[in-house]
């Protein structure tokens, strides 16, 4: 059975801190607690506008984390220099718009292949694995392969927002086909965005998906049940769904 891994996104711990400009809650402490509760990696998005995660968070987590870091960032020169300094195990390149509340869609890899080819190469030379956050689109998957990224993260936001059962089924099939294509090209497939306790199972049941990156839902649930329980419950749902997929 292919295992399924949980990456906890700690951005919204930092969002709460920045709302009052305090020193608490500490996203790095949240990361360490989540690791103890079963999170397999920690995801954090250092945005250009620094609206939640700050540079100091990235550097502190780099020194203290027990699992691995997945640093989400825009493909800019500034972010490249930071990634080269802190050397996260993984970098996930994402699109950014200053006016958006959260990442609204996948990266357009096909339109910037030359830039991303060089960008991915520099990170690879620094022993950082590169992931590209893209929509479940054949052209973008082929482009990801061409620029040298070994991993893609499929944007599940569209799936997460749907309520009509037929539309959900169609979107799941699109994600499955995209996953199959990526695997056939030798890419590792992760997924994330908008996943929560009531919709994660269908994505976790796609056997070829290796990791799910989830943040908002877990941090929200932590208000009521505590972070360790929120993390362990999400991990349990994911693992159960993966096991059921193999049992048929």
Swiss-Prot record:
EC number: 2.6.99.2
Active site (UniProt): 45 (proton acceptor), 72 (proton acceptor), 193 (proton donor)
InterPro entries per record: Aldolase_TIM, PyrdxlP_synth_PdxJ, Pyridoxine-5'_phos_synth
Catalytic reaction list: 3-amino-2-oxopropyl phosphate + 1-deoxy-D-xylulose 5-phosphate = pyridoxine 5'-phosphate + phosphate + 2 H2O + H(+)
Broad enzyme group: transferase
Keyword Ligase recorded: no
Gene Ontology cellular component terms for the protein in this record: cytosol
Chain residues that bind 1-deoxy-D-xylulose 5-phosphate: 11-12, 47, 52, 102
Pathway: Cofactor biosynthesis; pyridoxine 5'-phosphate biosynthesis; pyridoxine 5'-phosphate from D-erythrose 4-phosphate: step 5/5
Compartments (UniProt record): Cytoplasm
TM annotation in the entry: none
The organism's place on the tree of life at top rank: Bacteria
Gene3D superfamilies: Aldolase class I
Binding site for 3-amino-2-oxopropyl phosphate: 9, 20, 194, 215-216
Residues marked Transition state stabilizer (site): 153
Record-level GO BP terms: pyridoxine biosynthetic process
One of the record's GO molecular function terms: pyridoxine 5'-phosphate synthase activity
Keywords: Cytoplasm, Pyridoxine biosynthesis, Transferase
Main location: cytoplasm
Function: Catalyzes the complicated ring closure reaction between the two acyclic compounds 1-deoxy-D-xylulose-5-phosphate (DXP) and 3-amino-2-oxopropyl phosphate (1-amino-acetone-3-phosphate or AAP) to form pyridoxine 5'-phosphate (PNP) and inorganic phosphate.
Homology family: Belongs to the PNP synthase family.
Quaternary state and interactors: Homooctamer; tetramer of dimers.
PANTHER family found in the cross-reference section: PYRIDOXINE 5'-PHOSPHATE SYNTHASE (PTHR30456:SF0)
The protein's name: Pyridoxine 5'-phosphate synthase
Source organism of the structure: Hydrogenovibrio crunogenus (strain DSM 25203 / XCL-2) (Thiomicrospira crunogena)
Gene name linked to the record: pdxJ
């Amino acid at each position: 059975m292919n295992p399924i891994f949980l990456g906890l996104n700690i951005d919204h711990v930092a969002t709460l801190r920045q709302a009052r400009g305090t020193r608490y809650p500490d996203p790095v402490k949240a990361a360490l607690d989540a690791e103890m509760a079963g999170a397999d990696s920690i995801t954090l998005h250092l945005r250009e506008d620094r609206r939640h995660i700050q540079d100091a968070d990235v550097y502190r987590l780099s020194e203290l984390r027990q699992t691995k870091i997945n640093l989400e960032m825009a493909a800019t020169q500034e972010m490249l220099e930071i990634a080269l300094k802190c050397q996260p195990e993984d970098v996930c390149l994402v699109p950014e718009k200053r006016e958006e509340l959260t990442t609204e869609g996948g990266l357009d890899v096909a339109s910037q292949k030359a830039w991303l080819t060089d960008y991915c190469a520099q990170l690879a030379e620094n022993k950082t694995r590169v992931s590209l956050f893209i929509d479940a689109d054949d052209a973008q998957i082929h482009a990801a392969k061409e620029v040298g990224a070994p991993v893609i993260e499929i944007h599940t936001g569209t799936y997460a927002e749907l309520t009509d059962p037929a539309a959900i089924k169609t979107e799941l099939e699109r994600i499955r086909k995209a996953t199959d294509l990526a695997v056939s090209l030798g890419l590792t497939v992760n997924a994330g965005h908008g996943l929560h306790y009531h919709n994660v199972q269908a994505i976790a049941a796609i056997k070829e998906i290796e990791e799910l990156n989830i943040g908002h839902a877990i941090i929200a649930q932590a208000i009521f049940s505590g972070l360790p329980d929120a993390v362990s419950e999400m991990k349990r749902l994911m693992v159960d769904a993966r096991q059921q997929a193999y049992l048929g």
